[in-house]
């Protein structure tokens, strides 16, 4: 699969969307220093429907089940703030980029996006919240510190605004060879990594593509995922399943994806040993800024200061309830904080780095 061609075409499409003609993306026509349309001060209070969309970083059926009551909770909170919302439709996109494109087109009103996806589509969408999450007791940058039952990842009560991406070697014969080198304190070479069969995520996925590419560039003198010989694009569940089946040597994921697939590793996928012993971390990325909640700029009733403030307050309030914690726990989000576009300048720089 030619990852480079896909990433270039996505960037081109995003730029075309961002520069296209048509109606103004908001009632206000004023623009900021970067040419982005600024939100109007206010908009209408009666809104027939809203469309929320989540990205498929977890299995779609699990996301739909977890978020099934979010619409009702949101409508009630907005009612307290003077808004009458008719209905809230919740869906899961086919890919990260599909959610970004839907926001850009205005066919989706709100989306939960990784920082890298937001950075690519921020000409026509605006971040309003950033996720917070509980960190881990282990925050090491040394990959071997993450491996084995003795180093099983444990959650911390400390909230953090970042997470790490992890590069894992699976239990295939070649994956075990790579893990043995890392656990012995040896550095992996480009030749070592290029011989492996890799599985990655969409090209705007922070932990599934962008930051692993930056890790490769740092380790291998500028080489990235697009330079690897054997790469396939899978969702996270398929990555772990194919690693368990020894069909893939290296997978990439957020820290620590092994928590999400620990039971399946042995009960469903037939592995005899634990995921902590068999799926070894061989690389740790830089810190990734947390996921976003982003609104479209295409609809004046959405893209105005009054609505966005009410939206921010409502989601934050929901996230503090027991039911809200369960809903957003599907993404390991422990809460939300108000955000601004400039918070994701680093994500834009990272995105540019992987396109070189």
Task: State each model region's role.
Residues 15-18:
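C-terminal motif of bacterial Sec signal peptides marking the signal peptidase cleavage site
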Residues 20-23:
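Bacterial signal peptide processing site
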Residues 30-54, 58-69, 219, 299-356:
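An extracytoplasmic/periplasmic, membrane-proximal ligand-sensing/linker region
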Residues 49-56, 131-155, 161-164, 269-301, ...:
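Periplasmic-binding protein-like
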Residues 54-56, 94-96, 106-119, 124-125, ...:
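Beta->alpha turn/N-cap motifs
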Residues 83-101, 114, 224-245:
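Short helix-initiation/N-cap motifs at beta->coil->alpha
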Residues 133-205:
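A conserved helix-loop-strand patch within extracytoplasmic ligand-binding domains
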Residues 182-189, 194-302:
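Pocket-lining segment of extracytoplasmic ligand-binding domains
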């Amino acid at each position: 699969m030619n990852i480079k061609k896909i990433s270039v075409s996505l960037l081109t499409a995003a730029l075309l969307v961002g520069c296209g003609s048509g109606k103004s993306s908001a009632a206000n026509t004023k623009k900021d220093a970067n040419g982005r349309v600024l939100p109007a001060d206010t908009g209408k209070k009666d809104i027939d429907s809203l469309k929320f969309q989540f990205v498929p970083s977890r299995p779609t059926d699990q996301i739909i089940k977890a978020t099934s009551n979010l619409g009702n909770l949101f409508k009630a909170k907005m009612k307290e703030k003077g808004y009458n919302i008719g209905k809230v439709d919740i869906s899961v996109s086919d890919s990260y980029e599909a959610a970004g494109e839907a926001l850009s087109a205005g066919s989706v009103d709100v989306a939960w996006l990784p920082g890298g996806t937001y950075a690519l589509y921020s000409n026509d969408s605006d971040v309003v919240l950033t996720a917070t999450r509980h960190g881990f007791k282990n925050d090491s940058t040394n990959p071997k510190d993450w491996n084995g039952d003795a180093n099983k990842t444990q959650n911390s009560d400390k909230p953090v605004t970042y997470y790490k991406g992890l590069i894992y070697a699976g239990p295939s014969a070649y994956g075990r060879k790579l893990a043995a080198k890392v656990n012995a304190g040896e550095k992996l070479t480009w030749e070592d990594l290029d011989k492996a069969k890799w599985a990655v995520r969409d090209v705007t996925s922070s932990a599934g593509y962008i930051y692993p590419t930056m890790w490769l560039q740092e380790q291998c003198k500028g080489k990235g995922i697009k330079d690897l010989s054997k790469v396939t694009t899978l969702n996270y569940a398929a990555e772990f399943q194919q690693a368990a089946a020894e069909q893939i040597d290296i997978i990439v994921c957020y820290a620590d994806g092994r928590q999400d697939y620990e039971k399946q590793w042995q009960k469903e996928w037939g592995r005899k040993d634990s995921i902590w012993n068999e799926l070894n971390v061989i690389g740790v990325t830089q810190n990734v800024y947390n996921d976003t909640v982003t609104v479209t700029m295409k609809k004046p009733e959405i893209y105005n200061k009054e609505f966005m403030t009410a939206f921010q307050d409502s989601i934050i309030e929901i996230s503090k309830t027991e039911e809200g914690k369960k809903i957003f726990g599907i993404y390991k989000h422990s809460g939300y904080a108000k955000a601004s576009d400039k918070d994701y300048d680093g994500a834009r720089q990272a995105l540019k780095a992987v396109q070189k």
